[in-house]
Amino acid sequence: MLSLSLSVANAAWPERPITLVVMYAPGGGTDTVLRTLATEMSAATGWRINVVNRPGAAGALATRYVMNKPSDGYTLMGTSSFNKYSRVGGGGDSRSWTDWYYMQAATALGSWAVRPESPYKTFEDVIAAAKASPGKLTISTSGAGGQWHEVAAVVAHSAGIELKYVPYASGQRAALAGLNGEVDIAGGGVHEHIQFVDTGKLISLQQSGLTDITTKSGKVMPSLADMLPSVQEQLPPNGTYNLGIRRDTPYEIIKQVEAAFIAAANSDKFKNMMAQRSFVAEVKVGDAADRRAAELETVSAATFERLKIPGAKTAAELGLPDPGNFNQWWPPQGYRALPPTPE
């Protein structure tokens, strides 16, 4: 495990509690992962980390809040997908790989499900009904322009249907909206649906993994790849969960936070939580995380432009390449990776 000893220059940091601002409401995947990380970071270091939620505008509200705080390491950011929707959706200008230092802990799969009494028992039923009544079937999302909105829009586009997207403050609330009959289809992540599918309260229509998922009770969450193979070339990468810190924070403090993050992500309690929620462990830090952040934003900018998402900025406006040219574009002019921690 990485050493968590402080440098002499910053031995007194932190002198007070740290605040972790989560961009979605309590109960969803982002909140669950970041709260567990905060608990395990505290256990590894003795730091006191308070978690607060500031949902809204697909992360833009939380982003502005943290950006308006001093860059002293006392206010951290908890996001999904490197907070890519804030900039792509027009809610902010900060870039994830130049203005922030993000660390990735895990990834998650998308999911659609319905109540047992729904007239739609399969993904094919939804396609047929949506084609018969374009734009009438409703699906819940974790927020306008967010991860599960993007995934649902790409699936609908690939299937040749139109849906009505109903935003909620988190993936968990989107799942509950489907459970309570507020929408025709519950959107969200596998981790937010699997417990309800397992107990028979929801029926799985599809999930974005490459293979079927079988719950503890034997219920099957079918892979979208088997029903709509062409969508795999268009789907955005699966959702990720990230801890961020302002990049203009003193370097020694950033590396202390990174060391605590890595210790937390490798803890038994964090790994057990991920297994229970069907998350996938995938830790990235440094230039690998920066590259991933830029790649995800590039894919989403192209997707939002193609789907004509209202208010979204184009790749040209954001200074991003076509996804097919990303490898040639990265690293962009002016990019500077943070130095790695000395051995």
Residue ranges and their predicted role:
Residues 41-44, 65-75, 87-173, 240-273:
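Hinge/capping helix and adjacent helix->loop/strand transition within the periplasmic-binding protein
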Residues 193-266, 271, 320-343:
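C-terminal lobe and pocket-closing loops
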Residues 1-5:
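Bacterial N-terminal signal peptides
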